[in-house]
Amino acid sequence: MTQTLSQLENSGAFIERHIGPDAAQQQEMLNAVGAQSLNALTGQIVPKDIQLATPPQVGAPATEYAALAELKAIASRNKRFTSYIGMGYTAVQLPPVILRNMLENPGWYTAYTPYQPEVSQGRLEALLNFQQVTLDLTGLDMASASLLDEATAAAEAMAMAKRVSKLKNANRFFVASDVHPQTLDVVRTRAETFGFEVIVDDAQKVLDHQDIFGVLLQQVGTTGEIHDYTALISELKSRKIVVSVAADIMALVLLTAPGKQGADIVFGSAQRFGVPMGYGGPHAAFFAAKDEYKRSMPGRIIGVSKDAAGNTALRMAMQTREQHIRREKANSNICTSQVLLANIASLYAVYHGPIGLKRIANRIHRLTDILAAGLQQKGLKLRHAHYFDTLCVEVADKAGVLARAEAAEINLRSDILNAVGITLDETTTRENVMQLFSVLLGDNHGLDIDTLDKDVAHDSRSIQPAMLRDDEILTHPVFNRYHSETEMMRYMHSLERKDLALNQAMIPLGSCTMKLNAAAEMIPITWPEFAELHPFCPPEQAEGYQQMIAQLADWLVKLTGYDAVCMQPNSGAQGEYAGLLAIRHYHESRNEGHRDICLIPASAHGTNPASAHMAGMQVVVVACDKNGNIDLTDLRAKAEQAGDNLSCIMVTYPSTHGVYEETIREVCEVVHQFGGQVYLDGANMNAQVGITSPGFIGADVSHLNLHKTFCIPHGGGGPGMGPIGVKAHLAPFVPGHSVVQIEGMLTRQGAVSAAPFGSASILPISWMYIRMMGAEGLKKASQVAILNANYIASRLQDAFPVLYTGRDGRVAHECILDIRPLKEETGISELDIAKRLIDYGFHAPTMSFPVAGTLMVEPTESESKVELDRFIDAMLAIRAEIDQVKAGVWPLEDNPLVNAPHIQSELVAEWAHPYSREVAVFPAGVADKYWPTVKRLDDVYGDRNLFCSCVPISEYQ
């Protein structure tokens, strides 16, 4: 036997699991593209001056089992205290049926944002249910399909209030003093770049202030008080002031809807509908507004439309508001939202239904009443008479109370002067309440839960009668049917079957990096050591998190060539925003606050100009040459014209045109020459890792899409993570946090996300990926991603010309197929090809980005040659079908492409088409068939007849 023990131990086994093509397949593809080896191919494609001489030092690979054991040991350093801190975060009970069938199910978590509605009807229905929950609980007319968190939703509400305000000269935004501190933090950060003045005061004093365009109120207040704002809102409305309310979703089950009180905008966190705290996230925010403001709303909105056969179908509505179309004029820079978490909250509401939710809310409130009655009976004073689940208890010996709490492994809110805060939740039991009595009163309190229960059951006055909800909620059948586990399991499976995710087929979306989300990477996110921590718990209780985050940050520093990494941004768009703010504050620190011009190539992703606008910058577009590269002559001219006002350039590398631009270092030098900074968008980092790095290239700051390059799943449209890497001179200007001091960060800047480490509970996914791949595997992943893209490009080039190539006719990790000549010849469009691919069992590539009339394909390293060939064969078969149209065999108005996709019911319907049923639904011998449930959507109908709440069950049948 010639193998050594080290070889038999095979610590790099996961590399072969993650990378799709085996060694033999890789060699076949290398032969097809005319390269001798992966290193030779990389050497041909990547400019010599930016190739790393040595790989980043992130360690050797580990097996799945070794990495899990190592991370488990780290996680065990976290202390699982019972947290009553509140402040927008509570413990939950995630129903096991949802845990197993959604959160742990790749059919849900590996799907992409539903831009292709025909393959997304399941999660679109779940999101429509989420919108219905939002509408019922807020009492408003229009709801979005989730935002990133409550604090960023507050910032979006402020921006929206200004957009819709009739008080055009007013420039002040009022925030009630009992709004959660992290919310105020994020609002202040956003207001600064928009030039708004934020006024913080008692809500009842709002009328003392002038020039207010909008008001933010909290229901329930951060220390627990329920407010009856009916009269105040009425007065504010009479003065044309836009009113936003941050609301507790569980409290809204019992309380009067803010919309009924006159609020214009209502938002909040849906976390306590089944989503673990996870040390701060990810969590979905809900957001609702009056119908008249619908076109000013941020984020995705799911609407009811019709398909080509006239059947009810769902789609993302009014996309013309969004960044990928409106760019710097968009309502928001939001791209990824929190779809997976919104769907968990949605299904939590479906499973419990209105009766179950009321039982949970009433139980929480009853236990709070019992706790309040016992404390008052023993002489303690409550700061607020009206409350739902949170008590603000005045204590003489605060230090003693906190010491007893710590000894009992309990966290109380401790930042209130001369008082402690206690927030109960759905996990709270009568035993927990007895333990709280002991902490606050001593062991010999003599209180009895049943006796107190009898007292408060007949005489509870903690919710004002006027604030009790008097209307029914969740009356739609979907919330009143699936309450047994069997029914719920089948309902969730029926939704899953409607969608196309990575567990069924390759998703070749360009600029999206739909790679493997390995099971070993996903396992740790549901460990209670990670899932149950409150984001504001004492740091000594989160030593495991701190170690894991620090180690991940260190790896990312080495992989990016930067000096520091900030983990706070909880999406790629938030990362862009945070990075641009760092640049802005850096210039201000040098008395160069006038630098506000951001250069952006014409090919840029839509979030770039939208983020620049949010950061208070002016966007100046730089032209691209005929080869799709940044036009250096135009860049120099624009930089010189900007002069002392140049703030930065935002550039993606490899470019969004799918090539490694040879002049990238020269681009950086030109911008630096004029005093600007270089923001290198990390969207295409999957073609850099181990080969080059942004810092080595010459950039100053980048965001990293951990949900692309570093294996966090897309979740059907979120969660994402967008940490930023910065050079040392920008490190003092990354986001900070008003509640938690971030260890190792000297920044004094405001927050961009509610939690200090963003969506911390999904960071273990990226930790596991890097740990299992090691330096060797990470570089190989980038190389195979490049190989796979070039293999597709070379095989499809004759049928679908590749629009842009780099040196030696190569592409980077993705390629753009130019459909425009075919469309001109035949009338068949990129849309027709995209929809026809569904019949072949594939999600479409990215359509018309970054160039209209094209398809951008990114296969990633995780797809095997077998799957690549299946996709290539499908594309070539479609090209043959287009030739049939061109030859007149099939008319342009009636052929398999323009009628695609085809659904099962067509097999048994009358058939009058000039092609067979077999050609329609089993083209080119497709065997493993994915069946879409709707035909092509009517986008125009959907936007002209906007309807964004649940439709009758009969419409789905």
UniProtKB/Swiss-Prot annotation:
Quaternary structure and partners: The glycine cleavage system is composed of four proteins: P, T, L and H.
One CC-aspect GO term: cytosol
Gene: gcvP
Native source species: Escherichia coli O157:H7
Taxonomy, superkingdom: Bacteria
Protein name per its UniProtKB record: Glycine dehydrogenase (decarboxylating)
Protein's job: The glycine cleavage system catalyzes the degradation of glycine. The P protein binds the alpha-amino group of glycine through its pyridoxal phosphate cofactor; CO(2) is released and the remaining methylamine moiety is then transferred to the lipoamide cofactor of the H protein.
GO molecular function terms listed in the Swiss-Prot or TrEMBL record: glycine binding; glycine dehydrogenase (decarboxylating) activity; pyridoxal phosphate binding
Keywords linked to the UniProt accession: Oxidoreductase, Pyridoxal phosphate
Pfam families in alphabetical order: GcvP2_C, GDC-P
EC top class named in words: oxidoreductase
